């Protein structure tokens, strides 16, 4: 969170045997939702992991909570603020609820079981390549993923594409 102008929508809670600190971090050139897992001794939080749940360009203002099943759930705004003049009828929506976990020292996120029936394996906006994929967006820079893909799931809702790579190891939320 270094070199940030400010942080919005902070959340701090116990998640499993760790504590979770989240915030939307605003830097000069980006707005990202960031996560820290670590320990809390009652007065000091010591982060053990820092990262982002979603690598896409359009995820912000995440809200994290524990549900009645004990899952750590994240719902974020997919804002589209850069496109307000481009598509005036909307400037985003909320993401699907995702269960987030710290697994093998890495943050993962995957749609909660209640919405998994919406998942598909392909979408016209997603172009598979030999070593990843790209997501075409109307007149704007494409989103590109390079890496091994063992599993790829997609949820599309209108102009929103949420892509889950390798069981949620990488996530891309994109306003098309």
What does each of the following model-derived ranges do?
Residues 15, 25-42, 56-59:
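Acidic, glycine-rich loop-and-beta core segments that form the ion-binding/anion-interacting portion
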Residues 2-7, 55-58:
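Short glycine-/Asp-/Thr-/Trp-enriched loop segments that recur within the blades
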Residues 39-60, 65-176:
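Beta-rich accessory regions
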Residues 1-2, 9-13, 17-27, 71-83:
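Hydrophobic core segments of beta-strands in well-ordered, beta-rich domains
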């Amino acid at each position: 969170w270094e070199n940030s102008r400010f942080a919005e929508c902070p959340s701090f809670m116990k998640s499993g045997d760790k504590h979770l600190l989240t915030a939307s971090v605003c830097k000069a050139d980006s707005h990202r939702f960031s996560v820290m897992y670590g320990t809390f001794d009652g007065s000091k939080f010591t982060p053990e992991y820092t990262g982002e749940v979603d690598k896409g360009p359009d995820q912000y203002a995440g809200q994290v909570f524990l549900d009645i099943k004990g899952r750590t759930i994240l719902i974020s705004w997919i804002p589209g603020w850069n496109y307000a003049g481009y598509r005036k009828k909307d400037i985003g929506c909320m993401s699907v609820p995702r269960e987030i976990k710290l697994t093998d020292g890495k943050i993962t996120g995957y749609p909660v079981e209640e919405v998994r029936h919406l998942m598909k394996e392909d979408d016209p906006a997603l172009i598979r390549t030999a070593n990843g994929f790209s997501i075409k967006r109307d007149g704007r820079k494409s989103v590109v993923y390079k890496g091994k893909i063992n599993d790829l799931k997609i949820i599309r809702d209108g102009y929103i594409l949420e892509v889950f790579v390798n069981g949620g190891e990488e996530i891309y939320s994109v306003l098309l």
